[in-house]
Amino acid sequence: MTAPDLPFLQSDRIIFKLFACQEHLKNIKNIKLEHGDLLSKDARVKAEMEIDSLISQMIGTVDSLLFRIIDRFQLTGIQSDRIEIPAIISGLSAQSNGIELAKKLQDANLLGGSYWRFKDLRNYSLSGSLLSAEASLDVIPYFEQTLVQLKEFIKNIITNEPILQTKESQI
């Protein structure tokens, strides 16, 4: 694929990040098909790398959304290398047209919320493997479901905030 085939590579990083998530999930499925088990000696390292990459892209998808929110709502005082949901919530809450979005981000960031779960998953993967013989987690269906939840979260926010939409924003 070349850049002209994929115009969203330049214009919509949220869609690109979701595309990357789907590719990493597809790679995990292919590893399982090829080796029969993600825990096998030959598959384990590849599977771990793809899982870590998938988790990073999931967090990156939300980060891209946060960058767009900062840009489109013209939030000032938030450093691009220190983007945190609480700072964005504070900036949005100060604008009359950002209160509803601030509430959605607040809910997502609370314990058990969608963004909190993505961060918790990443934090867990920093200290341990999601792949283990003891774990009852079947990672492929889990990540399929998590990716659906991520898409729904992004779509819900973009659909309800026209200022965040792009011509490519068909999630």
Predicted segments with their positions:
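Acidic, Ser/Thr/Gly/Pro-rich intrinsically disordered interaction regions
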Residues: 1-56, 60, 64-171
